[in-house]
């Protein structure tokens, strides 16, 4: 049972030739043939169990790593921690209370559980969506507006934003505990069962509510994320082009001057951060200081710019791929259920006819997968998170200090190197103190 997937029904629970019931806010067919019913139930249990276990294990692991590993406590990871909590909440308060009543054809948990679970599920979906938006805006500020965003890119500000998203979500979803109730119905064997139903007083209110949810939980967040990640991708591509041109220019200058290319050993020290790992930049070695002291200011900056080009190029391409996956999977997981909700609110009969049975089960399952793919996208695909996982659990193979050396993260004490990814901001890069 999922609040966002509440396929609301105002009419009767029976529509020939197949009796349609809204059990636990899910459409199902009451008179399916026995072999087909058993086969579908087996597949449903298998898929639900797999997604449930993956979500619980993945999000629990994310929460554990982010809490126990001090170097993982960045601004971005604070949002990821909130996202993991909301995804875990969605899994725990959604999937069992959808699957079990679907199999039993009866909501057996009582009215209090019906109201509580609908409320928690609606809140978890809302928090997840708002966290995704907050992460996209935070990444936009860190990558596209690094100097301006430093004013508000702090852990305390992130905690305030997270607290606001949770409070706002709990407030928005207050209609669910108010209007969620158990509705009795008679099954084919003349036994009385219950459905957990979210019913507003009128069709107009239902349509308005579904339109409201469609806007604030899908359309508006989707547009914001597409725009934010689109601008980030554009900025990264500009940075890649700038890196390539700077590398070529620096190489030509070294060849023409007959100099030896120093600074190559420090390439990894200037690798751009993705915000998921916190690593102090090591002080320059004595040889590097001597090389820098014998060069002009412009030469130092050129070497710094060019030395990290290869590493930056790889890191930026990896970030772009991850951002594309984030946006695509967000729409893939949530577009079907939001579309079904709107269809259900405006054309109940047609929605019942086309969505009952397997289609709605697949749509619901697709929306549930969002709770398990987020840890994979944001953390498990990230090298720094894997290093944090290994540091948190000593039983895992330790990659050694070389695994984290030179991977500079986002520091908020002003001692790290801050550089924009675009050609317009490279001149602001400092190796001593943050720009003001």
From Swiss-Prot:
It comes from Mus musculus. One of its GO terms (cellular component) is nucleoplasm. It is found in: Cell membrane. The chain crosses the membrane at residues 42-67, 78-104, 116-137, 158-178, 211-234, 322-342, 358-381. This is Cholecystokinin receptor type A. Glycans are attached at residues 10, 24, 190. Pfam families: 7tm_1 (PF00001), CholecysA-Rec_N (PF09193). SUPFAM superfamilies: Family A G protein-coupled receptor-like. SMART domains: 7TM_GPCR_Srsx. Residues 68-77, 138-157, 235-321, 382-436 are cytoplasmic. InterPro entries: Cholcskin_rcpt, Cholcy_rcpt_A, CholecystokininA_recpt_N, CholecystokininA_recpt_N_sf, GPCR_Rhodpsn, GPCR_Rhodpsn_7TM. Belongs to the G-protein coupled receptor 1 family. PANTHER family: CHOLECYSTOKININ RECEPTOR TYPE A (PTHR24238:SF81), G-PROTEIN COUPLED RECEPTOR (PTHR24238). Residues 252-280 are annotated as: Disordered. Disulfide bonds join 18-29, 114-196. It comes from the Eukaryota. GO terms for molecular function: cholecystokinin receptor activity; peptide hormone binding. Gene3D superfamilies: Cholecystokinin A receptor, N-terminal domain (4.10.670.10), Rhodopsin 7-helix transmembrane proteins (1.20.1070.10). The keyword Magnesium does not apply.
